[in-house]
Amino acid sequence: MVPVLIKDLLSSKPEGQQVKVCGWVRSVRDSKGLVFIQVNDGSCFSNIQLTFDRNNPSNNANVNNIEETLKKLNTGASVRAIGALIESPASGQAVEVTLEDIECLGTCNPEEYPLQKNKMSMEYLRENAHLRARTNTFGAVYRVRNQMAFAVHSFFQERGFQYMNAPEITCSDCEG
């Protein structure tokens, strides 16, 4: 099964079809037998919510694997999840994925990657440049830059131009 981008899931009609989602965990909440995992893949600003009901798991759920994986999950972990896309019963999002299986592809050490659930200041991101790509602000900037570069390249390609990366030729003529 091919993973589906979160931006495509959020704009689709929920019909209970099985989907595969890959991305980074933004938050994990466990409350009274219900587990909520917010996942983002960078394709859009919004997250998709993965849900798991410990008291009433779906018939296809790999319960033991889900429980083991949930112990490893924290903010920043990368996951691959399979589940049914359904209309969300709660307000806040139109659709959600009920977990049938989940795999932790990589954990995130909070000491090496001090990702915060709340918004990180620009000063904090300046000091921790490796975290920029995981923020909504920089993700939006990267998506805009991608669209702009694509438009410029398309414009020139349609007019017969070719793109080339010229090598940098530099010389060092230092004084003193």
Roles of regions detected by a PLM:
Residues 1-176:
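Class II aminoacyl-tRNA synthetase catalytic cores and aaRS-like
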